[in-house]
Structure formats: structure tokens, C-alpha cells
Amino acid sequence: MVMKFRMVKFARIPSYNQLFSGDPVWATLEVGGIGMDGRSMVTKNCYRFLHTLENMGPAPEPNLTVLYSSALPENFKKYAAKVSINTSSVQYENDDVMKPVWGDDYSICCCVSATQTGKEMQFFGARANLLKALLYAINGGMDEKLKTQVGPCYAPITTDELTWDIVKPAYLRMLDWLAGLYVNVLNLIHYMHDKYYYEAAEMALIDTHVKRSFATGIAGFSHCVDSISALKYAKVTAIRDESGMVYDYKTEGEFPKYGNDDDRADDIAKWLLKTFIDMVKKHHTYRDSEPSTSILTITSNVVYGKATGSTPDGRRAWTPLAPGANPSY
């Protein structure tokens, strides 16, 4: 089964492969978990699936995900940890958090999203680069790499010293534009998928009246939080080229960083996440699906970083973004 999943290849245009690393097919296989009655759901096949990473070598897909609970058998936890250390290819999700919502018969859809098996489906939504949106807000929609107008032609910020009070209104305006564009493009993609029945055979295996979620995602999350934190708590000076476009930043002073158990940074993270999903929810979603968002763990951070210039948190231009919800250090 694992071998079959590894053999699947989609015919895709080069620009698609430039955006998604590893030629993904979005296949996730879950192992482990604890039943609603308290019994372990670990079987011999759980060990066999994990062992494929050792006898066949690591691979991004199928995405092997351990539904983790402290109540899992000790030997299984040790074996999963051993495979993780040797292959760096195992994903862990908190079964204790998800089980009260979805029960014990749930699957991980795409990458990280729980869905009740046979009763729910997800329209995959990739992710929006909220860090690049911050740079667009500062430069009035001008792209710092292409040197052309890509976002809406809003007034750029012209002050040399950048503060959050100055940048925030422009950023909110740019985020609102991005959320609308994001949902519109996803609606088009999902409509065309249904029109050409790419997944017809899979859909035949689940309930007729299925609950649909409309997934969105965020790229550059920790850098975005840290950049806002720098604007709030440090001194950030814009460095401009001869045309006046900001291409770099000089940041002086300390500022709280995401991932250090500092409420000042964590409050920014919560604000950013809630603000963006609220903007997404303002728009009609395909087939009345329920909007959701996630901060994914997959590796598109590299290709997103190649398109994103220097940022106020100190990250250099065109370097990888921190993956998913991970801190930027």
C-alpha cells in the first residue's frame, strides 16, 4: 500500500512544482490513537507502516501520522520515537485534543486537519503568504522581487521609521484584499475539480450528505508575528532603493519573539490568526463549506521564502521561511 502511494505521480505544470515541494498527492495515513472506550488502537499494521520508512527509506508521502496520546502502549511510543529520530518523517497529532470533537474514527485530511471518516471532507486550500502581504502593505502593493505592481495600488508608507501604529492600517487593508482574492481563487479551483470529477471514485466511498470544510492556510506565520513584534517593541528603519521602494530593514533593540512563552508575542499570533480567518469568513465559500485555517507543517516554506524579501524581524531576503507553526529561530 505504501509502495503504491509512493508510485503515484500527477502530470503537473512546472509552476505547480515550484510552489509545492515533494510532488505531493496529499495522502495521509494515521496510526495509533486511543478508542473512546480507552483501549489502544495500535495494531501490528501500525508497526509495519512505520517500518516502511526504515526498509524503504524516508519519503514525504504517504504522510505517516501518529495519533499521539500518553495512554499509548510504551513500546509503540518508543518505536515511533526511534523511527522519528532515524528518518525525520513522522508527524504527530494530539489524539486527546481531537477525539472529544471527532470521536475515535477520524482521519487526517491532507496534512493536519481532522475529519470524521466517511462523514466529512475538506476542500484543500494551500496557504497565503501573510509575511509577503506585510511587505506589500509597506510598499503599496509593489512586489519587492519583481519590482512591479502586483497587489492593489494603495499608498505606500513613506516614513523612514516604521511603527506598528503606522503599518497596521495598511496591513489590515492588504490582508482584506488578500483574503478575498484567496477565497475567490479557491472557489474556482474547487469548482473545476468537481466539474472534471478528479476525485469521483473517492467520493463514492463516503456519505451522500457530507459536511464540507473550506481549508485555508498561512505561510510565514512566525516571521510575520516577529516582524509585527519588532514594529511594536523595537526601532525599525526602512532602507529604500533609488525608486523609494523598501527592500531592507534596520532593526534596533530587543523585541519578544514567537515560540518563547512570551504573552506579548503570543497575543500577536492569536490576533493575526483570528483577524485573517475572520476576513476569510466574510466571503462566500464553495458549496457552503465551513471556512477553517491551519498553520501547516509541510515544506513549502522553502519555495515561499524564495519569493519573499527581507523582513523587519531580521530574516534575509529569499531565504526559507520557518515551516508551519515553528518559531523562526
Where are these regions (language model features)?
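Conserved catalytic cores of very large enzyme subunits
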Residues: 1-329
